């Protein structure tokens, strides 16, 4: 499958599947995975980028291990809402991944996710060296948590309307 919208996620997930969040960096891929209730994002170890074929193999194995049904990928928009070069790189990554997996990708605006992740790690008194190792997975968790919160609000609005 190609890409999907956040509203489609509940229909795309099979029982027992989770949602993954990705934060693409130039040197690492941050990964986070939801719980089965789609309430909480849990950071996973970062994937050190080597070359695409290896990166894809490692990522797909991690997604299989966590029984992922949908991939939420951070779209690094500029602060003014325009698409910059990193947006193009993210879209290219998804296009290259699509032939390798049937999992749908959902783009999610990730503005300020890395800033929020760094502040959270500083607040937890994580040393500068360890922050560098964890920042992309923490950012992936922020991206995913934002999407999970949106899904929760959508479910609540559907319940209130019904």
UniProtKB/Swiss-Prot annotation:
It is found in: Cytoplasm. Its main location: cytoplasm. Pfam families: RuvX. It is an enzyme of class 3 (hydrolase). Its EC number is 3.1.-.-. One of its GO terms (molecular function) is nuclease activity. It comes from the Bacteria. One of its GO terms (cellular component) is cytosol. Keywords: Cytoplasm, Hydrolase, Nuclease, Ribosome biogenesis. GO terms for biological process: rRNA 5'-end processing. Could be a nuclease involved in processing of the 5'-end of pre-16S rRNA. Belongs to the YqgF nuclease family. This is Putative pre-16S rRNA nuclease. It comes from Brucella abortus (strain 2308). The lineage of its organism: Bacteria, Pseudomonadati, Pseudomonadota, Alphaproteobacteria, Hyphomicrobiales.
């Amino acid at each position: 499958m190609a890409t999907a919208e956040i509203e489609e996620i509940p229909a795309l997930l099979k029982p027992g599947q989770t949602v993954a969040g990705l934060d693409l960096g130039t040197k690492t891929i941050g990964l986070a995975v939801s719980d089965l209730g789609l309430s909480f994002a849990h950071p996973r170890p970062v994937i050190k980028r080597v070359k695409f074929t290896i990166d894809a193999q490692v990522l797909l194995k991690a997604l299989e291990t966590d029984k992922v049904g949908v991939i939420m990928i951070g779209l690094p928009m500029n602060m003014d809402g325009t698409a910059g070069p990193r947006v193009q790189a993210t879209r290219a990554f998804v296009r290259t991944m699509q032939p390798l997996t049937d999992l749908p990708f959902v783009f999610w605006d990730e503005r300020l996710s890395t800033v929020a992740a760094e502040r959270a790690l500083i607040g937890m008194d994580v040393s500068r060296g360890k922050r560098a190792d964890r920042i992309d997975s923490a950012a992936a968790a922020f991206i995913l948590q934002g999407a999970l919160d949106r899904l929760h609000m959508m479910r609540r609005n559907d319940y209130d309307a019904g």
